[in-house]
Design a protein with these regions (language model features):
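Short beta-strand/turn micro-motifs composed of small residues
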Residues: 1, 19-20, 141
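A generic, well-ordered mixed alpha/beta core segment in the N-terminal half of proteins
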Residues: 1-2, 8
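Short helix-loop capping/hinge motifs at secondary-structure junctions, enriched
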Residues: 4-5, 186
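Short, active-site-adjacent cap segments at secondary-structure transitions
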Residues: 5, 23-25, 144-147
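Polar helix-capping/helix-linker motif
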Residues: 6-7, 101, 120, 129
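N-terminal targeting leaders only when they are immediately followed by extended low-complexity/repeat-rich tracts
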Residues: 10-18, 186, 190
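Accessory alpha-helical/coil subdomains and C-terminal extensions
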Residues: 13-114, 119-120, 198-207
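C-terminal non-catalytic interaction/assembly regions of soluble proteins
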Residues: 111-207
Length: 207
């Protein structure tokens, strides 16, 4: 659980959400331990604060929105999203079963390293066909740290040519939430792709 004093202090003094006393930003955080209370880690972004007897904030690392407005919960989320995890030996049947889910709008595709996948012709054709049907496919890395750089290797460039969009250094969790949010607000596939290439609340790093 949370330390009530520490949590209250953190809540009142910073504009960005933090996890527990580790002070890690929510948008870059993944759960990495099933047994430990200290279960969340942020590998692509440094801690925003260190909490002990006192709280020390790393102010330059904290995301500051352009304007400060009261919290507005967003309930319009489109759940027609799926995760496609690429693995060695993946079969056409597995990919086809996911890309042909009725009503599917977006896919978070977990790839190798800096955004690579097997260069199977059938895989590229299936991805291209899905994109042409209006499905937005976002490429995120399976690695805990690092970023998708689809221009780096030929396999990544082929994914770009098929219409796959870079997820940069987004976590899978954040990419899923972002797709749900964007489609939930009635955006077209092209509008969703445009918003995937920019940071809405500091959730991705674009050089």
């Amino acid at each position: 659980g949370k330390d009530p004093i520490t949590s209250e202090e953190l809540k009142n003094k910073k504009p960005e959400d933090l996890f527990k006393t580790d002070g890690e930003g929510v948008t870059f955080t993944s759960k990495t331990n099933a047994d430990n209370f200290n279960a969340f880690r942020s590998y692509n972004y440094p801690p925003l604060a260190h909490a002990g007897i006192s709280i020390k904030y790393d102010i330059p690392q904290i995301y500051h929105p352009v304007s400060r407005k009261p919290l507005k919960p967003h309930y319009l989320l489109d759940r027609n999203i799926a995760i496609l995890k690429i693995f060695p030996g993946i079969s056409p049947q597995v990919v086809e079963s996911i890309l042909n889910i009725p009503g599917l709008k977006g896919v978070v595709m977990e790839t190798f390293g800096s955004g690579n996948a097997p260069g199977y012709d059938w895989l590229l054709e299936m991805l291209k066909d899905a994109v042409e049907r209006g499905i937005v496919i976002v490429n995120v890395t399976q690695c805990l740290a690092g970023s998708v750089e689809m221009h780096r290797y030929e396999t990544g460039r082929k994914l770009l040519q098929a219409g796959v969009v870079s997820g940069y250094d987004s976590t899978t969790e954040c990419a899923v939430a972002k797709l749900m949010f964007l489609f939930g607000h009635g955006m077209t596939p092209d509008e969703v792709k445009e918003h995937l290439n920019c940071s809405l609340i500091g959730e991705i790093t674009i050089a």
